[in-house]
Every structure is written in C-alpha cells, then in structure tokens.
C-alpha cells in the first residue's frame, strides 16, 4: 500500500458537441442573461445548468504518515460509497435509488449513523428530474435529520466540469 497518492484531472468541454449534446437533452439553463442566477440546484425555478470547465487534484495520505511528517490535515476519510444508477441514459431513477444506495453504502462503510452527517455536497444539476430524485433520496436516507443539515452543490458555482468532478468529489464521509 502507498503512503500517499495524487489524483487529478481537467476538463475543457465547452465545445460544439458538448453544448449540442446537453442542449439536445434540455439540460442547459436558459437564464444566460444573468449568470449569477442561472444554475440553481434544488430551487423551485431551476431550469438546467451552465456548462463549466476546470480541473482539480486531491492528495490522499495515510493518517499516520501525514501525522509523522507534520502535515496539515484538512479531513479524514472515514467511509466511501459506490453505486451506479443505470435507470436511464440522461435521467436518474425517479425515486433516487442510485443516490440512496451510494449514501447508505458510505454511511455503512464509515461505521457512523446518518445522524452523524452534518454537510452533504450533492450532484445538484439544477434539472427538474435530477434535483427531484436527489431530494427524494436525501429524505429517504436522512429522514427528519435532513432539516438540521447543510446541503449544497458545487455545480451552482462552477457548472458541471464533466468527469473532473468525479475525481474531486466522491461520496465520502470525512471528519
């Protein structure tokens, strides 16, 4: 096993085929005149997202190794969750089954309970189908505890950066 790993990537997907594909499935916001309000995950008036480009990198290190070298530790990964939602090519299962599965897997792997979670960074595409399914999944997993949590989506600030976000944001539980 390695003491530390670096994982990163970048995406520059604002090209004709990228815009055309997302436009064809009506996933793009039509609020282009006001970028600050265009992408609004979980908002009642959401209508899609604004494409983004970006890159990211994470450094993951064994806790003992990081402590021994005096590293500043930002978080400890205590659980991970993996799942797949193969319901439809462009839409999640209406009840959020894939999201429910990944969140439950992560919580189970951590040894914590759903009441130990205080912040959730969701996929949050700002699309009517996606956000509705994620909201249902949050309710199914976190029940009444949902109302004492903070919920956000990085996409509201960056737009989806396609495959890069998979490297930068996975379903993890951190302390």
How does the language model describe each region?
Residues 87-96, 125-142, 161-163:
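Short glycine/threonine-rich loop-to-helix capping motif typified by GTGT followed
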Residues 10-14, 26, 55, 63-65, ...:
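Glycine-rich beta-alpha junction loops
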Residues 1, 25-50, 137-163:
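Conserved catalytic cysteine-centered active-site region
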Residues 35-110, 118-119:
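Condensing-enzyme catalytic core mediating Claisen C-C bond formation in acyl metabolism
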Residues 164-169:
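Conserved small/polar residues in nucleotide/adenosyl-binding loops
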Residues 6-10, 72-80, 115-122, 149-155:
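Beta-strand segments within the central parallel beta-sheet cores of soluble alpha/beta enzyme folds
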């Amino acid at each position: 096993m390695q003491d530390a790993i670096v994982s990163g990537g970048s995406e520059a997907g604002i090209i004709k085929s990228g815009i055309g594909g997302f436009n064809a499935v009506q996933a793009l916001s039509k609020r282009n005149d006001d970028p600050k309000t265009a992408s609004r995950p979980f908002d009642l008036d959401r209508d899609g997202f604004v494409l983004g480009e970006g890159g990211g990198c994470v450094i993951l290190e064994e806790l003992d190794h990081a402590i021994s070298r005096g590293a500043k530790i930002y978080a400890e990964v205590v659980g991970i969750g993996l799942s797949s939602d193969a319901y439809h090519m462009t839409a999640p299962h209406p009840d959020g089954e894939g999201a429910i599965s990944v969140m439950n897997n992560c919580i189970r792997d951590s040894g914590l309970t759903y009441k130990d979670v205080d912040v959730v960074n969701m996929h949050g595409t700002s699309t009517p189908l996606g956000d509705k399914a994620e909201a249902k999944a949050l309710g199914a997993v976190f029940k009444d505890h949902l109302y004492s949590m903070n919920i956000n989506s990085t996409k509201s600030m960056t737009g989806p950066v396609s495959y890069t976000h998979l490297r930068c944001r996975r379903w993890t539980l951190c302390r």
